[in-house]
Amino acid sequence: MSSELSEGELSHTSSSSSFVPVDQRQLQDAIQIINEEKRFNQSVLEYINKTAPADVGNNYHIISVFGSQSTGKSTLLNKLFNTNFDVMDESNRQQTTKGIWLAFSPVVSTTSGHTSSKSNILVMDVEGTDGRERGEDQDFERKAALFALSTSEILIINIWETQVGLYQGANMGLLKTVFEVNLSLFGKSKLEKHDDHKVLLLIVIRDYVGVTPVESLAKTFTQDLINMWASLAKPAELEHLQFADFFDVDFHALNHKVLQPKEFSEGINKLGDRLVVGDELFKPEYHHQVPIDGWVMYAGNCWEQIETNKDLDLPTQQILVAQFKCDEIVENVFQEFLKKFEQLFGEPQAEPDYEQIGALFSDLRNDTLEDYDISASKYNKSVYEQKRVKLISLVNEKFKEVFDFYAKELSSTMLKKFHSDVVALKGKNFAASVKELSTGLIASIVTTLGLISLQGDLSSNEVTTALSKDIADIVSKQQVIELNSIVNRAVKKLTNSLSKSIQFELGDPNENTWDTVLQQFNSLSQEVLTKYDGDFGLGTTDEQNKQALDRFQFKSWTSFYESMHKLISKEKLLVLLQDRFDDVFRYDENGLPKLYLNEADLEKTFTESKQHALKVLPILTIAKLSDGSEIVPEIDIFDHKLREKYLGVADEDSDDEDDDEHCFAEIVTEQEKSEVLAKFKKEVDAKYIETKRSIVQHITQIPYYIYLVIVFLGWNEFMAIIRNPLLFSLALLLGASVYILYKLNLLKPAIVVAQRTFDETVAMGKEKLREILIDDHETQGRNLGKIAGKNPSAPAEEYSDNIELDDM
């Protein structure tokens, strides 16, 4: 401490109740930052700027000392940090330090002498506890200890060795109260900001005699701190926080200052080494991470919060007056705001410019708050800020009305476009595309509404929640549509392929026909099931996917049933039987038309043809497998409830039809089968008669002797042909044609064709002649019938046929 400073120019006692004035010559002296009247000194920053090097910035450390009165706290600081805190007059034990003092440490005592720290060290000397001067009044002790704990990086707890393990002697009661209040005031910041800030509790054990190891003393004291922390009354949300989340603990022992002065000095120097040489005790998480001027402001705010905390003090009359006046100002300012608000936002814009609206929001709110600040800032700061928050809430509520209106309009417009976009997907990459569209929609709306949200004060969470629900409804409905579309397309594809398979099998039915058709059906069904494997790529639930597969299964079996009945109706069955009959009856194995020369051949072929046709009748009237079992669907397609569920078909006569038995495998009923057989027999019998008639006509031929007569009588004509070149050429061509037909084995078919052509020509000639000569066919037919002795009531058609047969 400078020897040039005179007694009259300085206050060398920390017990002074007035603030020490800052003077350029007092660079090593302390400044009282909190006096006995609990007032914070506003000159602290000025003191630091004059005592510490320029541009301190963040390069500083704050160390404070805490402990019982007259335990040598100030002496420890002076010896270690070379400060000038007043110490106790050993001839008279009384309180020396009053309030809280702050001093700049120019150098630190180390084993190598006085060492300058790389960082600027500021030391706080806190008024001792348990002093007789304050007696039972522990209010300032609690507040001073709490202040030191809240503003320091390292809190030195100065105790004697004999105090370790004691409760009151080690100030455990006071520490518990201080920790409890510190937790309630500053604990929430650790949750809200995820703050990892800690304070190092450096326990300096004084008058250490060396009998008990320091490690044992440290273990005892640390366990006492942990037990004390566990017994704290913590807020519910802070119950999980541990002592180690807030504090680190370290220990250092010092010998007796009077009895062992050399060892005491060595202990001081070793502690200095730990601070500045090894940089062992300062850690980044202890620092408050604010510049020195910010720390001064922080310290002032901390003291104000500690001093005015409701748990420690009651509202004063000044606060009550401030509350009344601030409420009055809020009401006046808000009414003025409402007038401007109505002028600006009374009528909504048809095509809103959200950026412009957001700017109007901000300007109007800032003007309103500025009016309030001018009138209310002179009152109690806490009340002023509280009522300012209330005014902001009132203003934001009015803005929220406009915000909600435009949010609703914007959401409605965007949802319509979203719906159109979702429908346009047509199931292509549906789940991924819908996710992209919905994410883009919400992001677009949030971005747009962010322009009128007053920098996020007006939350769009309600809008996005409702929007997400609407999006989910749209997507859910479209999912059902797309799911049904996929099922219907799959059923349609299966139906087409199955129909082709059935048609192919109808070309040549056999006992394995339905095995082949069923195998094709199962293959097509399995192809669909394998393709989707329970997931249709629509983002639908497992339950919806299962229902879709059940619907596909029901519709596929229904399609199987309908395809069989569509392709094998009784009309088509009759045509099929006729075609099979004709294949054998009219054509040979080479596909050439047959010419019957005798009735025996005709009857044999007729029997074979009819058997060939009727062989497939049992196969095509009921769907049976080669093992004789009928095809049975895996699901009852005739169940009325299932038909209504999967097909939307409500059978009105379902109650009347409950007793009817439906057989999936039955394609043609027995009655229909009888009708088909009757018609088939009639048709084939007609073909048989027609063919037999042509044989009879063919057999009736000219006698052979007639040809001799023709040769004899037509010899002259024959010679005339030979002598005529034209006629001779025609005769050669005719002979060559007959020879070629003979060699190609086509002579008989050619004769048949010629004969039938001639017969048809004659028949047509007779018909035309009859139409000319006879006007009333039926009358003439009856007359002819009477002449022939027929029944007059017989149909005219029968008589007409008889006439034709007789004529032929």
Swiss-Prot record:
CDD domains: GBP. Its EC number is 3.6.5.-. It comes from the Eukaryota. Residues 57-286 form the GB1/RHD3-type G domain. This is Protein SEY1. GTP binds at G67, S68, Q69, S70, T71, G72, K73, S74. The keyword Calcium does not apply. It is an enzyme of class 3 (hydrolase). Keywords: Endoplasmic reticulum, GTP-binding, Hydrolase, Membrane, Nucleotide-binding, Transmembrane, Transmembrane helix. Residues 1-21 are annotated as: Disordered. It is a multi-pass membrane protein. Residues 1-701, 747-808 are cytoplasmic. Cooperates with the reticulon proteins and tubule-shaping DP1 family proteins to generate and maintain the structure of the tubular endoplasmic reticulum network. Has GTPase activity, which is required for its function in ER organization. The keyword Transmembrane helix applies. GO terms for biological process: endoplasmic reticulum membrane fusion. The chain crosses the membrane at residues 702-722, 726-746. It comes from Candida tropicalis (strain ATCC MYA-3404 / T1) (Yeast). Its main location: endoplasmic reticulum. Belongs to the TRAFAC class dynamin-like GTPase superfamily. GB1/RHD3 GTPase family. RHD3 subfamily. It is found in: Endoplasmic reticulum membrane. One of its GO terms (molecular function) is GTP binding. Residues 723-725 are lumenal. Disulfide bonds: none annotated. GO terms for cellular component: endoplasmic reticulum membrane.
